[in-house]
């Protein structure tokens, strides 16, 4: 079994923008590659899990998202593969595109993306983490039995209080993805 770090995309690996629609607008945090490398060196699979309701809302297409992810992988995997998988949910019940306007177990805080990655990458959830910037990310981690690290980038500073109010027991609060990776790296094996 493998251990993994499930990582939210927007606000965690890259700058949060209102519905990232175009690959040209992708701005990866300057420390993201170092952070991902630290986790790889520690023996973790890096798995991105991201809600992309902009597809259901008609703001962009799955083809647009594919181009964004290709650019992300081109940046992060330039020297060595640092991202082992990308899982996304294009669904939202308030969408305008009928095929995506549904309830889905893939949409966080449900754990469908985590379970799919577990199956495809033979992941032991008990030895795995989730790093994200929202209450929804931390709720997903809680629902999946993962260790929870909230980063204060993106919406993290905003959602910290909600996590506390909703009794989400955070394992660590990190300034950013690099701080979170260093925290994991410093834990005993």
Question: Predicted regions: what is each one?
Answer:
Residues 1-47:
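Active-site neighborhood of HAD-like aspartate-dependent phosphohydrolases
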Residues 1-7, 182, 186-189:
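Non-catalytic pre-domain segments flanking phosphatase-related domains
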Residues 13-29, 55-64, 78-79, 96-105:
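Metal-dependent phosphoesterase signature
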Residues 32, 36-69, 82-95, 141:
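Substrate-recognition element of Asp-dependent hydrolases with the DxDx(T/V) motif
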Residues 105-138:
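Conserved Lys-Pro-Asp/Glu-containing loop-to-beta segment of HAD-superfamily phosphomonoesterases
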Residues 130-169:
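Acidic, Mg2+-coordinating phosphoryl-transfer loop and its flanking beta/alpha structural elements
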Residues 171-176, 180:
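Short acidic-hydrophobic, aromatic-tinged amphipathic segments that line or gate anion-handling sites
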